[in-house]
Amino acid sequence: MNKELASKFLSSIKHEREQDIQTTSRLLTTLSIQQLVQNGLAINNIHLENIRSGLIGKLYMELGPNLAVNDKIQRGDIKVGDIVLVRPAKTKVNTKTKPKVKKVSEDSNGEQAECSGVVYKMSDTQITIALEESQDVIATTFYSYSKLYILKTTNVVTYNRMESTMRKLSEISSPIQDKIIQYLVNERPFIPNTNSFQNIKSFLNPNLNDSQKTAINFAINNDLTIIHGPPGTGKTFTLIELIQQLLIKNPEERILICGPSNISVDTILERLTPLVPNNLLLRIGHPARLLDSNKRHSLDILSKKNTIVKDISQEIDKLIQENKKLKNYKQRKENWNEIKLLRKDLKKREFKTIKDLIIQSRIVVTTLHGSSSRELCSLYRDDPNFQLFDTLIIDEVSQAMEPQCWIPLIAHQNQFHKLVLAGDNKQLPPTIKTEDDKNVIHNLETTLFDRIIKIFPKRDMVKFLNVQYRMNQKIMEFPSHSMYNGKLLADATVANRLLIDLPTVDATPSEDDDDTKIPLIWYDTQGDEFQETADEATILGSKYNEGEIAIVKEHIENLRSFNVPENSIGVISPYNAQVSHLKKLIHDELKLTDIEISTVDGFQGREKDVIILSLVRSNEKFEVGFLKEERRLNVAMTRPRRQLVVVGNIEVLQRCGNKYLKSWSEWCEENADVRYPNIDDYL
């Protein structure tokens, strides 16, 4: 079974990689820099501020905005962890030749002035790119350019790691010894532990509900658990209690916590920080946001605190700065040779420090891909039987492709005695680039969560968290019945919460305008004046709807008149073009910069007091595109705490032929405050 599973994934990953590379190459070779910026695939008007040494053979290139153009960096869709190219701005993207890496500029030695690296940190005023030290000479030439730009490219490292993992899975010989892997390849039946089941006597968090306690008790006593946490049900709090109870049961327990993104694991780390001794926590990889509470656990920062390591790093940085002033290429080369000798010494000392830090820790937090990092796996080189971990926890499992989830299982094979998966398979699956092969799409969109419950139809290992602490009961009602079999309950503390209950909101609104008292509003945009438009400036002509934008603006201004805070409002849409137009109006023209505007996909895991959802689609053919993806809409309608405002054409949803959309729109006609706007009132 392991060979069959690995073979299926290897062919799917290969196809997905090819599709991803072809799509990216086509865009980079056919669009201008400005078009790439508009589509979020490039950042321009930046310059090199500094180069410094990083951990184990890394350089950090720090880039800032060109103040002659803008005082802030327009980040687009580029995020931490993305693979990027850094180039001088005078280079034009080749639009005539086949995709290839092109010589953009040369230094005196004829080397290509182009760097490839990983986005390490991002803010509105600085981007840090992690480079391999082999690019040091090229990187320093960028000081001579007033403008640089960044291009987002395909992350082939991700595909390489998944393929390597699948090959190793296929090579495991029968009979498989690893009990957890036996479950996952359907070679071992799952039988819940009933003989030696021991209930936890005392929970540390007094606010846990019965479903959370049941999930924790089950996970403590069983070697395979899925914690199904719908939106707002306190999944993270449940995991935090579980981790603490594992350490109480066995103080020597070693836990690896993984997730598909930096944000997912950083949230857990942030919550663990005040509850677990600092020396037991270790964060491996590049944190998406270096919060103060997380910095103290970063392997990078902790290793650099070693006095000798710090001294060598400072000497390297000093030599790098001196290189800025050297005009002669020969002198620069000599300087780099000295730097390379220092780096060799630095690597040895860093590896020793890193090994000590890992062994000292009890909880290691990293992404799924980071779980096979050389820092962790190097411990097996000296002792292949070294017991590094006991428990693996994968959070947000439904946002990861299954091959990603196998990375820690294979990298640390025969280590784990317990596997805990947490997530919600009714929210968005991982993003798949393939569009032309249904088998590939199915293989990669079917998550480990989904496949396990198919293998074990009794679902004995699935523990459902049934109380949500986010949404007003009316907002929760349709998602509960349509996606969670009506099992979701609103806690009494949130069941009737409204915008008017916020401390800043005017408590005595006029009788004619009581939007702060209503949890669910729908602006029905039927009619020719609310027709969608294809935005030719965006990739594949993403859709936008100017009429809906006008309604969004009016509703925001109404909320602001009642002193609803800007940062309590979120505006989301399934379409990038609509998001771009909304940002231009709300952020640039109205200067309401604290209102968060995002795609639905980008808002997964977030929440706001009020969410305004612009559906965009309004056409005579009743086409809805990817609105028919139930999980995307489930994410959208479960983001708000106190008010959900939908702006969309009800007739299109009811006549598009999709049962879910028809059911939702009909339910809202009965349960929401439905309004029929006249476009003339909004212009």
Swiss-Prot record:
Reaction equation(s) it catalyzes: ATP + H2O = ADP + phosphate + H(+)
At the top level, the lineage of the source is: Eukaryota
Q: Which residues bind ATP?
A: 229-236
UniProt KW keywords = ATP-binding, Cytoplasm, Helicase, Hydrolase, Nucleotide-binding, Nucleus
Family the UniProt entry places it in: Belongs to the DNA2/NAM7 helicase family.
Q: What is its EC number?
A: 3.6.4.12
Q: What does this protein do?
A: DNA polymerase alpha-associated DNA helicase which may be involved in DNA replication.
**Other observations noted:** Present with 1040 molecules/cell in log phase SD medium.
Induction statement: By heat shock.
Q: Has UniProt tagged this entry with the keyword Disulfide bond? A: no
GO cellular component terms?
Answer: cytoplasm; DNA helicase A complex; nuclear replisome
InterPro entries, A to Z: AAA+_ATPase, Coronavir_polyprotein_1ab, DNA2/NAM7-like_C, DNA2/NAM7_AAA_11, P-loop_NTPase, SF1_C_Upf1, SMUBP-2/Hcs1-like, SMUBP-2_HCS1_1B
Q: Where, per UniProt, does this protein localize?
A: Cytoplasm; Nucleus
Q: What protein does this entry describe? A: DNA polymerase alpha-associated DNA helicase A
What top-tier enzyme class does this entry carry? hydrolase
Q: What is the lineage of its organism?
A: Eukaryota, Fungi, Dikarya, Ascomycota, Saccharomycotina
